[in-house]
Amino acid sequence: MGIADANNAGNVHGGVIMHLCDEVAGIAAVRHSGSRVVTAAMDRMSFRHPVFVGQLVTVKATVNAVWRSSMEVGVRVESENVRTSEIVHTSTAYLTMVALDDEGKPTEIPPIKAVTQDEKRREREAQLRRDNRLAERQRMEEERDRA
């Protein structure tokens, strides 16, 4: 990462890392759906360790679960000290991406097949995050209606 990405302490801004996560999640979502996609939500962006100027950053994305027109993409960010080759897991994020047709409307996307134990775990956890998001939305709407 370069100096333009950093604050005055030499840490890469969190917003720069978030932008990378969004870009890579979008690529994974397009590859899976074959459609244009938009970001609908970003859940639990966790910054575990700082990224410093001069480190190499690797961003990996996996489609964890698919619903009718949306999917959850898990993103893992790692930084590497190029002098020592030490690799550190620095950030994790979960993004909900929505596939769009040519008219900009949500469109159905193909399911994924969770085969391995890890894929099944990711799919279960994605469903829990989705259920929590939808329940929170419902609670907020009910609260707004009472006000």
Language model features by range: what are they?
Residues 1-2:
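Short amphipathic
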Residues 5:
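Surface-exposed, Lys/Arg-rich phosphate-binding patches that contact polyanionic backbones
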Residues 10:
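Anion-recognition interface
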Residues 13:
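Conserved G/P- and acidic residue-centered "switch" motifs that form tight phosphate/ATP-binding loops
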Residues 16-34:
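Active-site helix/loop of acyl-thioester processing domains in fatty-acid/polyketide metabolism
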Residues 34-52:
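Small beta-barrel nucleic-acid-binding modules, principally OB-folds
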Residues 52-56, 64-147:
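HotDog/MaoC-like acyl-thioester-processing domains
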